[in-house]
Amino acid sequence: IDLDRFDIRTKISEDIYYFANDMENVSSIFSYFFLKKYYITDYKIQKNHGFKLHSKIRTFDEIKSPPFENEWGWYSTDIPPYYWLKDCKKEEFLCIVRDIYNNKFIFSSDYQQIFDNVNVINEKINNFIALHIRGGDIVYSSLRKHAGRKVLEERFFPYEIALEIIKRHTNANVKIIIFGQDVKSNMKLLNYIIENKILPKNKIFTVDEFINQTFNIFERTFFEMNLMSHALKIYTPGIQAQKSAFSQCAMMIAGRKNIISYHEIFSLKQQYQIIKSNLGLLGLDSLYDSMAYFQLYKLSRILNLTLDLSLNYIKKAMELDQDNDAWGIHYIYCCFLLGDLEAIETFLKVLLDSNKLNNLLQTFIISKSMRIYKEQEDCFISFRSTKIYPMINYVGIWLNYHYGEFVRMYKMYKNYQKYFNDLEVDTQCFFSCYQKKDLISNSAVLIVKNHLSYKLGKILLECKNLKDFVEIPIIIKYFLWESKNEKAYFKSFLFEIEKLDDYNQSCSIRNYLSYQLGKLIIESFKGWYKGYLLLLPYRAFILYRKIKKDKR
């Protein structure tokens, strides 16, 4: 449900049969007595991942006594308390949660019936391991464009890895049940196992073989989670504490540690070899194969394999998912590493000519301040070359502008201004007060970065050579003029910076050396008649030493 903004929807067609997340009415799930005692309807309690609660090791007394995160208490977290709560013993915690969950008064009659049916089915199956395969929620939604976001990469469970786990259980005296929302892909895995005589049909199943087909999506989910809890082992994606919340919930229902991540079984080198060997065997949707090639690309970089090999993998990923601009970003990055600037320039020009460049640019900033593509962006943001690459510089200008690095943006623009006319790209938008207002109005960080103090400090700190020093008066003159114009234009607009989500982050920017140095310069010019300008070099040196000391 927390990923609903990524348009993860149920998809049923000739080729795809995938169930997305869904939520049932609370009164349909829980009993009247349970809701009366525990249900909170206060609209002031917003969605929250509980990051603050598990941000440090705490004690029982600490979380029971004020000050709390909010006046009413704490937001809960999906990270189990034995990771962050002192003296919380794992085995004891799991047993307590299991006993609470098994209370007959929690669920409505319909859901209690599902709960009871699961117990009957489990007795018939007897001794099974579960493969909890996640992937459809990523490959069938815009999440696949967030390929750099660690938590999403950790949630993905490649079918190629699942196949290998099954192969390693051929001689085990247990049954295997394949769990997951992608019904068709699960069936393809099952059929491959049976047709290739890896396991007989009475040894391996998909969870759909046990599900009442009249269930709605949430009832299916409830059934799956409860059946999964009975598994001897649950193979899941995820690293360390950040495993799938679905699998972890099944573990808590079980009251024992029965989940194991495939990362704990296979080294990165083994994962690379397994995906490479099994890719294409199951006849999965091309989006899965594209993701598998991206996994090979990512692993090849971690394992320090050749750049040419990495480039080949990301090209194959692009061929199979042509709408995924995340792959384009990684292709460009690989070309940067290879020093093939001509290939990057050509690729960007093709996107421009086909009106697809903006899609790539928006994918760069898709995670906003999290900057999941920071490593790739930095190649553009700090780009310097003696040769002429207008497209690369245009992307650098665009990124600097959208991240509030207006000084760097202006300098890149001045150096390449005469080349942009031939490209037919709009560069005037970077100098429009109207466009600037729209850019910064929803970000406290960008508002602060647009302060003259920050920009003046950046002008001095970003001087890298003699040419930069010579241009200082010209650049300062421009930003003084810009500041005057924007001050007049923004006068009629109210920026309620304290109410913006990134306000706390913006406060830290005010303490940056660049901001403090710019502020000192402005104060010195305002107090020139008191001799402040003469003291400026000394005061700047003292400021530098103070900030450097504070960083330690």
State the predicted function of each range.
Residues 1, 221-270:
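A donor-sugar binding/catalytic signature common to diverse glycosyltransferases
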Residues 266-340, 366-368:
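Leloir-type glycosyltransferase catalytic cores
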Residues 307-319, 342-355, 376-389, 408-417:
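Alpha-helical repeat scaffolds
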Residues 387-552:
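Boundary detector for helix-to-coil junctions that initiate low-complexity/charged tails
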Residues 128-160, 177-184, 298:
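Active-site donor-nucleotide binding/catalytic segment of nucleotide-sugar enzymes
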